[in-house]
Amino acid sequence: MAARKAAKKLTDRIPRPKKKVTWPQARAFSVHLLTASGSFLAFLSLVAASEERWTAMFWWLGLALFVDGIDGPIARKLEVKEILPTWSGELLDNIIDYVTYVLIPAFALYQRGFMGEGLSFLSAAIIVVSSAIYYADTGMKTKENFFKGFPVVWNMVVFTLFVIEPGQWVSFAVVVVAGILTFVPINFIHPVRVVRLRPFNLTMTLLWCAFGALALAQAALAAFYDQIGVLGAQVSTFIKIGITITGLYLACIGGIMQFFPNLGAKKA
């Protein structure tokens, strides 16, 4: 009898779930799992980079970029933040973004070494340090959802450098300028969340992605014969021009809209 009472007291101390997991909670948590899948894509990309399989690396980064582009709208649609207030989707997103947008591109730039060992090492240092500081800035977004300063999309920058191959000093200058612009109050576009010129900005973003996919497809065909190749040498001039023009547009349109605040605004 005493043993039963002791066992009952012990079971009473064990915390029990107050309620079952509801369908909205399970659905909301699945969005966090979608975001978290980017970490595995980052791992696959890192493996490819360590083996100097640049085409595969950028395919994995591109897939991670796609996941990053859809998880936010889905989370807002399903009201994930309100349903699971103790789970921070924003923190999870930032952790994965730092790896896929910053750390792996910096490693690839250093590993590729087309700027020479010294400049590649210095460029990687500029990328990872400036980006870490940027992610700590809680005021990185404006009221219109522009990014304030270069939004550390080093995956796009490094991809462009791999494809265009402008030379070591031009490449280094691009890294330095982008690193400085991280801390300059110039607006950069968020193609989805900025309302002004959104259809056109989305079109240019999709065009950049399309040119990027074509570049990787061309490189993949060439890599069928040589798995470890130079990405830029395998891409046609037309695609290089397309990536350059659309990339420059996305880099500059935010600043242009900042200085022309009525550009793209709906008339009252």
Swiss-Prot record:
Catalyses which reaction(s): a CDP-1,2-diacyl-sn-glycerol + choline = a 1,2-diacyl-sn-glycero-3-phosphocholine + CMP + H(+)
Location relative to the cell: Cell inner membrane
Protein family membership: Belongs to the CDP-alcohol phosphatidyltransferase class-I family.
UniProt keyword terms in alphabetical order: Cell inner membrane, Cell membrane, Lipid biosynthesis, Lipid metabolism, Manganese, Membrane, Phospholipid biosynthesis, Phospholipid metabolism, Transferase, Transmembrane, Transmembrane helix
Cofactors (names): Mn(2+)
Organism: Mesorhizobium japonicum (strain LMG 29417 / CECT 9101 / MAFF 303099)
Periplasmic-side positions: 49-53, 110-112, 167-168, 225-240
Cytoplasmic side: 1-27, 75-88, 134-145, 190-203, 262-268
Job description of the protein: Condenses choline with CDP-diglyceride to produce phosphatidylcholine and CMP.
Name of the protein described by the UniProt record: Phosphatidylcholine synthase
Pfam name, any one: CDP-OH_P_transf
GO cellular component labels: plasma membrane
Gene Ontology biological process terms in this record: phospholipid biosynthetic process
This enzyme's EC code(s): 2.7.8.24
Membrane topology per record: Multi-pass membrane protein
Transmembrane intervals: 28-48, 54-74, 89-109, 113-133, 146-166, 169-189, 204-224, 241-261
GO molecular function, one term: phosphatidylcholine synthase activity
